[in-house]
Amino acid sequence: MPTMGAEMNTRNMRYILLTGLLPMASAFGETALQCAALTDNVTRLACYDRIFAAQLPSSAGQEGQESKAVLNLTETVRSSLDKGEAVIVVEKGGDALPADSAGETADIYTPLSLMYDLDKNDLRGLLGVREHNPMYLMPLWYNNSPNYAPGSPTRGTTVQEKFGQQKRAETKLQVSFKSKIAEDLFKTRADLWFGYTQRSDWQIYNQGRKSAPFRNTDYKPEIFLTQPVKADLPFGGRLRMLGAGFVHQSNGQSRPESRSWNRIYAMAGMEWGKLTVIPRVWVRAFDQSGDKNDNPDIADYMGYGDVKLQYRLNDRQNVYSVLRYNPKTGYGAIEAAYTFPIKGKLKGVVRGFHGYGESLIDYNHKQNGIGIGLMFNDLDGI
């Protein structure tokens, strides 16, 4: 039977523990709330990583926060040239989370890094749904030059009411996502992804005999590989990623409306401070020839590559653009957009387009368009 002295000691011990732990818990909670209040995804992730890593044992913390190995491109090329054979130099990064500043940590988790897991594998693991291309709903899109009679060299001219009677104003929506299907492949720690993008043009303001038809829908599945790399670029830039993939794009229609093409592409991811640049080059592949090809001249208008640019104005405002140009034909396109916060995770977007190829059915038709709509936070893509 415990004595009165033993009971007193137990109570004193509980009191000491409570008085010591409660302030710690309060401080920890306040710090976590400060992280939650951050609107910028990059800075918020860095804040959470820093405070929660501090609660782990030293060995677990170091293991969990160790940065992902990257291919040192400069040393790989230099060593391969010196030895006369292929030499892969993979650089194991140090601590990915500096303990002194969330701002310094945020410099590591850039939008490009988060999009493609260049510095750290995402906790959602394989097969998780991730952002890919911009995902938006534009209730109002105005096109100054509708394509009333779309055509191609092998399919002739399409004469249908949904094209001939279309209005200049319509609704545009795009859904896009990607999922990692394999990670840390080969000695270079590459990742394999599946992506899907679907864009629709809806004649919602056209209340004719065919009430509010979908004028066109493009489907674009793709599979691609990304490789984290490290190399310096002029003017303080950094080469962060190399990649390659295969993409199929079609509108799912029968002749004469059918449009489709397949491409193999190579890409790179580069950063200059708040500016992210992703150039791509492509070639047509596995397409049918002759009269079996829906659009044999599509490369004349869509070119052989594009350049994506994104610039972070501040925590929640971005501008981005996509540029295409074929120097041989002089045809191309420019897309530009501005995203801004509305409330919570909801963003607004203003988007403009000039040139050829706003959709597959319009690949050889020049037009100008502008629209305004909504975009969910984290789904503005790059």
UniProtKB/Swiss-Prot annotation:
GO biological process: lipid catabolic process
GO molecular function, one term: phospholipase A1 activity
Signal peptide: 1-27
Extracellular face of the membrane: 79-168, 203-213, 251-259, 285-306, 326-332, 357-365
Disulfide bond entries: none
Topological domains annotated Periplasmic: 28-65, 184-189, 234-236, 273-274, 314-315, 342-346, 378-382
Domain of life: Bacteria
CDD domains documented for this protein: OMPLA
Binding positions (Ca(2+) 2): S258
Pfam families reported for this sequence: PLA1
Catalytic class of the enzyme: hydrolase
Reactions that this protein is recorded to catalyse: a 1,2-diacyl-sn-glycero-3-phosphocholine + H2O = a 2-acyl-sn-glycero-3-phosphocholine + a fatty acid + H(+); a 1,2-diacyl-sn-glycero-3-phosphocholine + H2O = a 1-acyl-sn-glycero-3-phosphocholine + a fatty acid + H(+)
Keywords in alphabetical order: Calcium, Cell outer membrane, Hydrolase, Lipid degradation, Lipid metabolism, Membrane, Metal-binding, Signal, Transmembrane, Transmembrane beta strand
Membrane topology field: Multi-pass membrane protein
EC number(s) on file: 3.1.1.32, 3.1.1.4
Gene Ontology CC annotations of this record: cell outer membrane
Entries under SUPFAM superfamilies matching the protein: Outer membrane phospholipase A (OMPLA) (SSF56931)
Active site feature: H248, S250
Residues passing through the membrane, by range: 66-78, 169-183, 190-202, 214-233, 237-250, 260-272, 275-284, 307-313, 316-325, 333-341, 347-356, 366-377
Cofactor(s) the protein requires to work: Ca(2+)
Other remarks on this protein: Present in outer membrane vesicle formulations which are used as vaccines in human.
Job of this protein: Hydrolysis of phosphatidylcholine with phospholipase A2 (EC 3.1.1.4) and phospholipase A1 (EC 3.1.1.32) activities.
Record family assignment: Belongs to the phospholipase A1 family.
Name this polypeptide is given: Putative phospholipase A1
Organism: Neisseria meningitidis serogroup B (strain ATCC BAA-335 / MC58)
